[in-house]
A protein has these predicted regions:
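Positively charged n-region of N-terminal signal peptides that target proteins for export
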Residues: 1-5
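Bacterial N-terminal signal peptides
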Residues: 6-16
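Electrostatic cytochrome c docking/interface patches
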Residues: 17-34, 44-52, 102-130
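Sequence context surrounding c-type heme c attachment/ligation sites in exported
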Residues: 28-35, 61, 125-137, 156-165
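The canonical Cys-X-X-Cys-His
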Residues: 35-43, 96, 133-142, 200
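Axial heme c-ligation environment in periplasmic c-type cytochrome domains
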Residues: 48-55, 70-112, 148-154, 173-198, ...
Length: 208
């Protein structure tokens, strides 16, 4: 278990590998493309029509680009996004990503009790050594804003249902968009229980 924890932490500490080194998006061009996105994600990019839809506003540009590229190629399958990116060039995806990255993020609030929030904070900041779960702060920062240069996403303020869904998909290896990072998210999530995922998602919602 100790070796597994150290291996996971080492992977988390490695520099991110990205298909594109520097962000190249133009927010002004992305704004026009985002009009259709507003139907599901809201005009502000943070008012999804369903509780399991992510906030896009303020999300890190490189992360957004990489996810959109995987969705467009079919590497990441999202039924809700079917057909939405047909005909988009890589530049279009960069522009769209830049537009949302430049929108103000939306703060959320945690709903858990003190005991739940304390436990969640302990996991987020320090991991769970006995289960080989690395601290979330290693990649996503104490504030939950992620690492824009590395392409690690901002988690702060994301809807609870969305975060629960993504951690569960990683745990069950349904989502595999962490291949370029050595499968780190699947390694982190694979031993988390439903209750641990739930309190983490609530805690993350309140980060800012």
């Amino acid at each position: 278990m100790v070796f597994r924890f150290l291996l996971t932490f080492t992977v988390l500490a490695l520099p991110a590998v990205s298909s594109v080194v520097n962000a190249m998006g133009d927010p002004s061009r992305g704004e026009a493309q985002a009009m259709v996105c507003a139907a599901c994600h809201g005009q502000d990019g943070a008012s999804g029509i369903a509780p399991n839809y992510p906030n896009l506003a303020g999300q890190n540009e490189k992360y957004l680009f990489n996810q959109l590229k995987m969705i467009a190629s079919g590497e990441r399958v999202l039924v809700e996004m079917t057909g939405q990116l047909i005909g988009k060039s890589e530049q279009d995806l960069w522009d769209l990503s830049a537009y949302y990255a430049n929108l103000p993020s939306k703060a959320g609030a945690s709903a858990g009790n003190d005991e739940e929030l304390e436990k969640a904070a302990s996991i987020y900041r320090g991991g769970i050594a006995r289960k080989g779960v690395a601290a979330c702060t290693a990649c996503h920062s104490p504030s939950g804003k992620g690492n824009s240069q590395a392409g690690y996403p901002s988690l702060a303020g994301q809807p609870v249902d969305y975060t629960i869904a993504q951690l569960t998909k990683y745990r069950e290896s349904v989502r595999k968009t962490d291949e370029s990072f050595g499968g780190m998210m699947r390694g982190v999530a694979e031993t988390l229980t439903d209750s641990e995922i739930a309190i983490l998602a609530d805690y993350i919602r309140g980060l800012h």
